[in-house]
Amino acid sequence: MEIIKNGKVFTKNFTFEKADIILDKGEIKDIIYFGNNGDSTNNSSDISGSTDANNNKSDNNYTRIIDANGLMVIPGLVDIHFHGCVGSDFCDATLEAVEKMAEYEKEHGIAAICPATMTLPKQRLMEICRNAKEYKDIQMNTKSLEKNNEQVNTSEKLKAKLVGINLEGPFISPDRVGAQNPEYVQKPDAEMLQELIDESGNMVKLVTIAPERGGAIECISKLHDKVRFSVGHTMANYDEATLAYESGAKHATHLYNAMTGLNHRNPGVVGAARDAKNVTAELICDGVHIHPSVVRATFSMFGSDRVILISDSMRACGMPDGESELGGQVVIKKGNEARLVTGELAGSVTNVYGCMVKAIEFGIPIADAIKAATY
């Protein structure tokens, strides 16, 4: 077993408490919190296999000891919307691409990923879904081997977990494609979406949709119990977006970007998402897509419970400056920006850990920023 000692641990109550964390085969087995007098007390009865706190006083019990004195210990981050990194893209539809992405993300503190597709032809999306299912099956088999104490390649443990697919296209507005290819935009189609869900083995978790498009509301009403619909890449006004949320949509794709903006007379998608109950909103906090003042305003409007930090990173993330590609389109990475040759922003080149750090730099309380990147 291993132990992380003396750290300020981010708890399920979104506060920091001094504690020791005991790990067994890379998983948390127990958390030993310290009382006001500095003595350790076991407050982790909800974690199976709890260890007597008194047994943790000897360092000889552990194969590895990490002294986190003066440091914060936080959960692994989650990125529910990114396309790629280190030269690979989810839409490459290869096991190698997903593996490289998962390795990079884990190296940067991201424990779980839900990578996004682009607006592409149906058959290409089917290939991407099949590839994700195959990768997930391999991932689950590895987990089964670990539980049975069978030999597992150590590298298998050093990858972020693939938890779903974010279908960012093709059911979007041709007038708000952003960096997507307008050639492959389609009207919302419940039958096609069901095929993609089936092909993925129910791995499709998020679906971006433009609610003003014909068939959108019907699609949301029919399938909202199977996937989480996200309003985005849309020209929808406040009323159209509100109808989508009333019909079962529960999310907003990269708030402010590729949608109608917030105006004092025309509140658009932003206003509708704010007013709808239980709707979460993505925020690309890379210092490029959103002004720091708007980041602060968004946390104030929505609250940390409803803001989800995302990276929306593309394959140039983690790579040197130069030419790259996104959805079949040429992208130029320069510094902390990635743009199409036309000048349109083409995703980010910052991972979600970097986005969390930016949020803190912009004045978001540390606990709120961590919460928005983990829960």
Ranges and model annotations:
Residues 1-40, 44, 52:
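N-terminal metal-binding scaffold of metallo-dependent hydrolase/deaminase domains
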Residues 38, 59-74, 198:
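Active-site metal-binding motif and surrounding structural segment of the metallo-beta-lactamase
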Residues 198-319:
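Active-site core of metal-dependent hydrolases
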Residues 83, 99-131, 160-173, 200-212, ...:
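Divalent metal-dependent hydrolysis catalytic cores, especially in the metallo-beta-lactamase
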Residues 271-281, 287, 299-311, 317-375:
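His/Asp/Glu-enriched, well-ordered alpha-helical/loop segment
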Residues 35-63, 137-159:
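Intrinsically disordered, low-complexity terminal tails and inter-domain linkers enriched
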Residues 104-114, 173-201, 245, 249-255, ...:
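Active-site gating loops and adjacent loop-to-helix segments of metal-dependent hydrolytic enzymes
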Residues 71-72, 80, 90-160, 184-199:
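Alpha-helical scaffold segments that flank or form the walls of functional sites
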